[in-house]
Amino acid sequence: MFLKAVTMQGFKSFANRTKIELDKTTTAIVGPNGSGKSNITDAITWVLGETSVKNLRGNKMEDVIFSGTDTKKPLGMAEVTIVFDNSDKSLNLPYNEVSVTRRMYRSLESEFLINNKKCRLKDIKELFMDTGIGKDGYSVIGQGKIESVLSSKPEDRRNIFEEAAGISKYKYKK
């Protein structure tokens, strides 16, 4: 399984629909300061269920919605879709591609979709549990994440290792 594409519209600095296509060999996103690298990682963790405004580098949740510039009006909605190659069936779905979408409106109402079918945030979290992918997974390592892990409490580090080892789903279902 690997991330094939990230499509953002109205998410933070990405006012216009922006699609980033990736392949198996992609290991990092690089670019100059201010080019949107951190917003791309925020988009990925957000669509996977991040609910902490602090982790999304904002003051309030609606900060993920494009707030406008001198030349562009603010938008009323943010939408992010990520597409995974699932030809190895790492995800327990009978599809070779799996898309996950999250939309949020200024009213703070959210919609979640798996392969364009409405679902709950819980369904997304369960789908990616023990894959190493998810808002708490370590497939996306943002600025400060490594330092955060190293300075975390032993119980928190244990949770990280349980997720990586694929046993956290058993604790979750208890």
Describe each model-derived feature in a short phrase.
Residues 2-174:
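Gly/Lys-enriched N-terminal cap/neck module of very large, oligomeric protein machines
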